């Protein structure tokens, strides 16, 4: 499995809140039964690398379907093939090291 961090930022003009669009993205992810986690600066999704690339395109398009004219999207994909990785593994590893020190 791979991990993708995605930040979809609809350019909403005068207003600054994009939470309504972020909520739509999370409704879509839930409907697709994808492991995902919202954090303050974006969303992390777990899946196969090829599926994550296709998903990124779909998530990028969602605000356009709501009438937004400009969307800025940032994608990071960690495609590790030497061992299985899951959502939360990196955080657990750091927390373990913090307990040791």
Where are these regions (language model features)?
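Charge-rich, low-complexity N-terminal segments
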Residues: 1-101
């Amino acid at each position: 499995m791979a991990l993708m961090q995605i930040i979809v930022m609809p350019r909403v003009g005068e207003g600054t809140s994009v939470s309504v669009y972020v909520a739509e993205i999370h409704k879509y992810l839930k409907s697709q039964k994808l492991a995902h986690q919202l954090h303050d600066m974006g969303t992390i999704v777990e899946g196969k690398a090829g599926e994550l690339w296709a998903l990124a395109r779909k998530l990028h398009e969602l605000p356009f379907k709501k009438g937004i004219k400009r969307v800025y999207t940032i994608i990071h994909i960690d495609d590790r093939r030497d061992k299985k990785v899951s959502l939360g593994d990196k955080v657990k590893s750091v927390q373990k090291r913090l307990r040791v020190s």
